[in-house]
């Protein structure tokens, strides 16, 4: 161990303030803290955890002196250093614990500690009393737990409330979807932080390196820059390591890493660090030590409601919240029960401090070290047992019918559900019964109407209809249609529903008519083309019958023997009839004319130009169809027109003169 130099005692006399004044100054701090703590305890009944604060402070000082003397192992000349170090280390955590910046320290004390303790504290840091592994364990994520338990002059019961607050925060994160408890504590905590003006722990860290390097050299060299409590005394580090061995680190690590970022994020928006830094050198450093004594408890106490509220919610939440989560998963999500959540949180908070007071009065005679170890194990189960029995019973009595446990919903699902939605409608049973006989398909029982207007979705209505009632299919369709009018008044919905159904039927009929008309047009066009070219499907016997109907039965054999089918009628003309055996000229002219009329073609006149086609479009198409084969069998007139490029010469032109004047597009 490196020894502290003897010239260390001559430092504090530079500003003319003897060392003997410092214990007196510390005693004045204690007296002021006692007075203000007594006043604050009378104003805040929920802060009973912190009633033994003056006793615990004295006991901490009494127990801290031998430990610190034992650990530091100073020479006899270093007794003044021990007192100064104890004062500085005891004052700094008490001021910095709740997030109060270093603005209450005067410039004179800053200069003294910085000049006198710079070199010796570096040496003592090199000869640190703890091994580096233990110091790193204290400084890492668990430093929030140990510093809150030990360095704060407030008794260590506050740490329990902070730990329980962290567990509440974790459980509330899991229950965030259910909307049961998380929204209210965060809002109340934010309001409390805004009222008390608590600054974020990161702001206190910004002030430490510049103003108090001598006081926290041992701890700040070991701690990372983001730690919020850099001034941990040696005795508290030793005690924290002992408690760390008794308490497994798994309990502290998952709790505080989630709480401290949340606190810093909530408090960061209140006072930015740029505002606190100019206040420290200017006005706040000039305040007298009396103001320090009075402001210290006033600023440390406002954090207590934060811890108390978290404590109370922690004691109430473990099982009641799980019960609420099991009881109302669906009702809480469907119905906006913000008011019931507020009532639950208000019921939990005022009940728990009284029981905390009873349990705390029993535990007050114990010293702070014992209470710090016993409270998380003994007091918590008792308080939780009380609060788990009483709040659940009172909640079941005071909660409205909508938020009763699911057992009641299972027994009476039809009586509870219609009530909140039934209040939306201003129509009684008489009006509904009066309208029933007018419309036959609406004659239903009152219970079904209640259920139908109460049910929120079509699926539930269909389930209730399928399980409790038997309806025909068109009636269910009408109810599906009536879902559109379910948000209207029942008096208006019935009439408007009929109109809507009528309009829907008209619309459906009009759509059906349009579809039918379009289908008819298509079928007519197809039938027209089929009828127009029906003769293409004739066989030679059918053609022979058609010739006999024209008045030439004697030529039936000629058409049958030559296999003149409907497709080959295009070739039946005056030039080809003699080859078939018909030699009578008059008969040839009559048969040729009837064939053109059947095929709807016109033979060109002799005056036409030689560039015009031999046939018109239909004639050309029929000539193409006259060939036998797969392509000619599947060929249609529209396909032929597109393939031949005759779109400009559609068959709409039927006059023979115009047909004769069509230009030739195909050789």
Curated annotation (Swiss-Prot):
Residues in SAM domain copies: 538-601
Query: Which PROSITE patterns does the record cross-reference, listed alphabetically?
Result: SAM_DOMAIN
Residues covered by region (Disordered) = 1-108, 147-424
* Record InterPro entries: SAM (IPR001660), SAM/pointed_sf (IPR013761)
Basic and acidic residues biased stretches: 19-53, 84-93, 187-196, 228-266, 284-314, 322-338, 346-364, 381-422
Q: Which CDD domains match?
A: SAM_Samd14
Q: For bias kind Acidic residues, which ranges apply? A: 1-18, 268-277
Top-level taxon in the UniProt lineage: Eukaryota
Name the PANTHER family for this protein: STERILE ALPHA MOTIF DOMAIN-CONTAINING PROTEIN 15
Q: What is this protein called?
A: Sterile alpha motif domain-containing protein 15
